[in-house]
Regions:
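Thiamine diphosphate
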Residues: 1-155, 157-298
């Protein structure tokens, strides 16, 4: 996802002179072609995330489209006040692109973990927040929002789902499988091998989204009503509760049950690789599907 984002951003940078790149000491080598093309619009500001966001505000007000890129906890938790005042309050066209979510940097410990990023940024008015599941999602989000006059937050991950082959008619809330027994909402890359998951013919409807801040509750209502689907709802997320569950709870009438499968509220004191932490938290594909089977076993 990150590698393909760099390719896409480089192409955008070379074809749109409004694009400015601000890096937090990551991605410099991968974006070398952009730096060489026009060094006046590409900057590595080091570990100065708060300053990067202030610069992004000024650049946006001057007619540029800044892309701020750094590691999730440093660009969201450390820089919350700047996100709120410089970008949210000013409602400027800008992109915050993070890496390391939720615990992609599993070997570096809690300082580099950030499962709460979407909930943190979604709490700021005027921000749009996205949890892409693959590289196609990332490109789709950026291209659709390039002219949107508000700040956008996009979390990148080292792991993609394999949904791209199914996305010929792209939607931000797509029904992938139908069954009346209930409905499972898969957010971003929460389930990596989602194609096999769909092909296993589970006894509940599966819908997919990457859109957190503007989660399409109207479309969800339509899917449920049109299909006569039981309102046993489960949200599966690759992060801590992003707020989608609250949107559903206040928008869908007569819910029978609502469940969350997400990163728990805890310090993760295990080390290793992302897949090790997934298994430890029972958020690997097999564990998630087993949990869903128990929820919809009737």
């Amino acid at each position: 996802m990150r590698k393909n984002f760099y390719k896409y951003l480089t192409s955008l940078f070379k074809n749109d002179n409004r694009t400015v790149i601000l890096l937090g000491d990551i991605g410099v080598f991968s974006l070398k072609s952009a730096f060489d093309h026009d060094p006046s619009r590409a900057y590595n500001l080091g570990i100065m995330e708060q300053s990067m966001i202030g610069a992004a505000c000024g650049l946006s007000k001057s007619g540029f489209i800044p892309f701020v890129h750094s590691i999730a906890p440093f660009i969201t938790e450390r820089s919350y006040e700047q996100l709120k005042l410089n970008l949210g309050y000013e409602k400027v066209n800008s992109f915050i692109i993070s890496v390391g979510n939720s615990y992609d940097y599993a070997g570096l410990g809690c300082t580099h973990h950030c499962p709460n990023d979407l909930r943190i940024v979604s709490s700021i008015p005027n921000f749009k927040t996205y949890c892409p599941g693959n590289s196609l999602d990332v490109q789709e989000i950026i291209s659709k929002n390039l002219e949107t006059q508000c700040p956008k937050y996009i979390r990148l991950s080292e792991v993609e789902n394999n949904l791209t082959s199914l996305q010929s008619n792209y939607e931000d809330l797509a029904e992938l499988h139908y069954n009346q027994n209930g409905i499972c909402i898969v957010v971003g890359n929460a389930i990596k091998d989602i194609v096999s998951f769909i092909n296993s013919n589970p006894n509940y409807t599966i819908v997919y989204t990457y859109n957190v801040s503007d989660f399409n509750t109207e479309k969800l209502n339509s899917i449920i009503d049109k299909g006569g689907i039981s309102k046993n709802i489960t949200v599966v997320e690759p992060c801590s509760d992003s707020g989608i569950i609250s949107k559903i709870a206040t928008s869908i009438k007569n819910i029978e049950s609502i469940n969350s499968i997400s990163v728990p509220k805890m310090f993760i004191e295990k080390y290793g690789k992302k897949e090790n932490i997934d298994k430890y938290l029972e958020l690997d594909d097999n564990s998630i599907i087993e949990k869903l089977s128990k929820i919809y076993e009737h």
